UniProtKB/Swiss-Prot annotation:
The gene is SODCC. Cu cation binds at H45, H47, H62, H119. Signal peptide: none annotated. InterPro entries: SOD-like_Cu/Zn_dom_sf (IPR036423), SOD_Cu/Zn_/chaperone (IPR024134), SOD_Cu/Zn_BS (IPR018152), SOD_Cu_Zn_dom (IPR001424). GO terms for molecular function: copper ion binding; superoxide dismutase activity. Belongs to the Cu-Zn superoxide dismutase family. GO terms for cellular component: cytoplasm. Destroys radicals which are normally produced within the cells and which are toxic to biological systems. Keywords: Antioxidant, Copper, Cytoplasm, Disulfide bond, Metal-binding, Oxidoreductase, Zinc. This is Superoxide dismutase [Cu-Zn]. Disulfide bonds join C56-C145. It comes from Capsicum annuum. Gene3D superfamilies: Superoxide dismutase, copper/zinc binding domain. The lineage of its organism: Eukaryota, Viridiplantae, Streptophyta, Embryophyta, Tracheophyta.
């Protein structure tokens, strides 16, 4: 079993911890707890870079090793890092579990060392009509991020 963690930080009082685990070649399980967000849906993605020197903006685009368009987690044509939305309750917190086959913790496509980002707005899952639909899901600004690191 390989485990990883990302501790979210933000200039907007958003905080949280995201845990990743993968057993062999099985899908990766992502479990998160985030607080300080506005209620509703928020885009949630693995980004290409583990660089936060310029805050969440320096994490680069969504992780996309296959060069595909943005989509929903269940779509075949999607960025590997497209994990959809997390749902935030009226109290500003979200607790969630996601299982995904395109974000391994080992091998050449590993997400270790990459960024994970919570966005300000809902991800339209590549199905909206906005000019950013096919690249970012029109999910808005980056309100919190962390770097995915191996956990002992």
């Amino acid at each position: 079993m390989v485990k990883a963690v990302a501790v979210l930080s933000s200039s907007e009082c958003v905080s949280g911890t995201i845990l990743f685990s993968q057993d062999g070649d099985a899908p990766t399980t992502v479990t998160g707890n985030v607080s300080g967000l506005k209620p509703g849906l928020h885009g949630f993605h693995v980004h290409a870079l583990g660089d936060t020197t310029n805050g969440c903006m320096s994490t680069g685009p969504h992780y996309n090793p296959a060069g595909k368009e943005h989509g929903a987690p269940e779509d075949e044509n999607r960025h590997a890092g497209d994990l959809g939305n997390i749902t935030v309750g009226e109290d500003g917190t979200a607790s969630f579990t996601i299982t995904d086959e395109q974000i391994p913790l080992t091998g050449p496509q590993s997400i270790i060392g990459r960024g994970v980002v919570v966005h300000a707005d809902p991800d339209d899952l590549g199905k909206g009509g906005h000019e950013l639909t096919k690249t970012t899901g029109n999910a808005g600004g980056r309100v919190a991020c962390g770097i995915i690191g191996l956990q002992g």
